[in-house]
Swiss-Prot record:
Protein's name according to its UniProt entry: UPF0213 protein YsiG
Coiled-coil regions listed: none
InterPro entries named in the record: GIY-YIG_endonuc, GIY-YIG_endonuc_sf, UPF0213_domain
Gene: ysiG
Family from the record: Belongs to the UPF0213 family.
GIY-YIG domain sequence ranges: 2-79
């Protein structure tokens, strides 16, 4: 069974970049070689701040989307600092599921 990761990088300009992968070491090396995402190419070097593991690609991609679109920078930094990314993501999914149940 594959393992999937949502990861957060800090770029040289102190901005954050979030992505997903199956191989953290390889992906970090790819980013730092300038062959990663367009966003990180001009912000090298990057360093890994946090990663969260998942059993399936969909959860890793959903966590990436949630981190990018549902949180502001202050929230992101707090979750990273307190190692709460996965816990808060699961809470978000549970709340979302409850809302969907009540809407039906």
């Amino acid at each position: 069974m594959n393992q999937y990761f949502t990861y957060i990088l800090q770029c040289s300009d102190k901005t954050l970049y979030c992505g997903y992968t199956t191989d953290l070491e390889k992906r970090l090396a790819t980013h730092n070689s300038g062959k990663g995402a367009k966003y990180t190419k001009t912000r090298l070097p990057v360093k890994l701040l946090a990663s969260v593991d998942f059993d399936n690609k969909n959860d890793a991609m959903s966590c990436e989307w949630w981190f990018k679109h549902k949180l502001v920078r202050k929230q992101k930094l707090s979750l990273i600092k307190n190692d709460l990314i996965k816990e808060k993501f699961i809470e978000y999914l549970e709340l979302k599921q409850k809302k969907n149940i009540h809407l039906k």
